[in-house]
């Protein structure tokens, strides 16, 4: 199994005492007056949903701030509604969160996965509220991801879909018979075996390249008995280390994982809520997400759009505002909280696009000039409906060893237990 065996033990969360509190993450302090600027991800009076965009050119402190946000979320689990545990899945394209960064692994108790025998099954049918013909939907989603990355044609797409359906049938799973769906689902190795043994299928095209990549690299676990639910796997911080792999392989892994995550999210219970507070269950962080976002994979947008109901938030980190796209590729409409560091190629239209300032030229110009002039570990923050504010960041290195959370505003520092 690819789980790092010697990852740091996850910090223990204090048991919930029944009091509903606000989870609080300190972005930093306002440059203007030093006041704390915070994010309240479970308080719907502050942010309707917890999706966030973090932007900044290389070297501006973007990764340090992102690590700080993740670490603080881990430490704030005690304030989650009902004391629900919080899982955070990180797609790490550059190796900024893996075992070569022991301070982060130690602070968060992160487990690191490498793309070898990943212990989940993209053809799994697990869940408590499953849609009709679920095996067909699952097979079609996997096929669509492969087709997008490897530019498959209609015939190749149909061929792959047929192989997956045949694999389900070989496992005794019938698409129209929900009573069969709890049987062990086929693994990718079983799908590949059906594909490779079918002499009628052409083997020198882009479909072959895709199947061969997945099989030769042994990315997915081939033994169904050694796989688990992805939702169950994402407990605490889980880092998927994609560094050193080709872009096609990286995007394929992220696409397959997000599609499975979305399916299992949809098949799970809605998160609890009480008045203004909503239970958070999981976060997804896609680091250096621009290449993946450009391919418009449906699962990412669906998670952004529908995750709130299930207590799921998404954090997208990129180097440019324009990576959030426009038209069919518009991700900005799903983001309520923005952290913008210095951006080297910033345009005024980028500011209007993200901050919706086209009707307020004065504010747009202020933001444009502010983003262009801020220094390292400084950012412009817009959280929910609050006005944008320029802050001195709270980077990860400042809080890594401060498990008492003394960096929080005084009213939010954890109470000392009674003697």
Q: Language-model segments: which ranges?
A:
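P-loop NTPase motor domains
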Residues: 12-17, 32, 57, 68-312, ...
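Conserved AAA+ ATPase core "coupling" helix
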Residues: 346-354
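Basic- and hydrophobic-enriched, low-structure N-terminal and domain-boundary segments
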Residues: 1-60, 64-65, 69-80, 298, ...
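A short helix-turn-beta junction within AAA+ P-loop NTPase domains corresponding to the substrate/partner-engaging
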Residues: 108-113, 329-341
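Conserved AAA+ ATPase "sensor/coupling" helix adjacent to the nucleotide-binding pocket
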Residues: 353-361
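Conserved P-loop NTPase motor module
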Residues: 1-6, 194, 252-253, 369-419
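H-loop/switch region of ABC-family ATPase nucleotide-binding domains
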Residues: 318
């Amino acid at each position: 199994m690819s789980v790092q065996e010697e990852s740091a033990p996850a910090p223990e969360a204090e048991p919930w005492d029944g009091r509903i509190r606000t989870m609080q993450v300190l972005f930093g302090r306002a440059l203007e007056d030093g006041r704390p600027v915070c994010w309240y991800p479970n308080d719907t009076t502050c942010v309707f949903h917890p999706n966030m965009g973090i932007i900044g050119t290389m070297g501006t402190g973007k990764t340090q701030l992102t690590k700080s946000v993740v670490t603080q979320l881990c430490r704030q689990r005690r304030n989650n509604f009902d004391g629900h545990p919080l899982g955070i899945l990180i797609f790490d394209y550059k190796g900024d969160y893996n075992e070569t960064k022991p301070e982060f692994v130690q602070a968060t108790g992160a487990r690191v996965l490498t793309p070898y025998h990943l212990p989940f099954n993209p053809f799994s049918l697990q869940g408590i509220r499953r849609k009709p013909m679920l095996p067909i939907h699952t097979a079609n989603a996997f096929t669509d991801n492969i087709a997008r990355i490897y530019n498959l044609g209609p015939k190749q797409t149909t061929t792959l879909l047929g192989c997956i359906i045949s694999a389900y049938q070989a496992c005794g799973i019938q698409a129209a018979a929900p009573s069969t769906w709890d049987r062990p689902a086929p693994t990718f190795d079983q799908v590949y075996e059906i594909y490779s043994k079918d002499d009628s299928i052409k083997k020198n095209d882009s479909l072959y390249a895709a199947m061969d990549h997945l099989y030769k690299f042994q990315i997915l676990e081939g033994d169904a008995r050694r796989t688990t639910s992805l939702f169950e796997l994402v407990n605490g911080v889980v880092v998927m280390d994609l560094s050193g792999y080709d872009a096609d392989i990286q995007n394929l892994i992220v696409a397959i994982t997000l599609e499975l995550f979305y399916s299992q999210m949809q098949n799970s219970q809605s998160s609890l809520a009480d008045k203004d507070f909503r239970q958070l269950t999981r976060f997804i962080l896609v680091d250096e997400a621009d290449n993946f976002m450009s391919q418009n994979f449906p699962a990412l947008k669906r998670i952004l759009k529908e995750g709130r109901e299930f207590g799921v938030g998404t954090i997208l980190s990129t180097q440019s505002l324009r990576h959030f796209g426009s038209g069919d590729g518009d991700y900005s409409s799903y983001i309520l909280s923005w952290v913008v560091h210095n951006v080297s190629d910033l345009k005024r239209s980028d500011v209007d696009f993200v901050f919706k300032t086209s009707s307020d030229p004065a504010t747009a110009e202020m933001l444009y000039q502010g983003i262009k002039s801020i220094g390292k570990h400084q950012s412009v923050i817009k959280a929910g409906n609050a006005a944008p504010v320029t802050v001195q960041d709270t980077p990860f290195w400042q809080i890594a060893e401060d498990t008492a959370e003394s960096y929080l505003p005084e009213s939010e520092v954890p109470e000392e237990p009674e003697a």
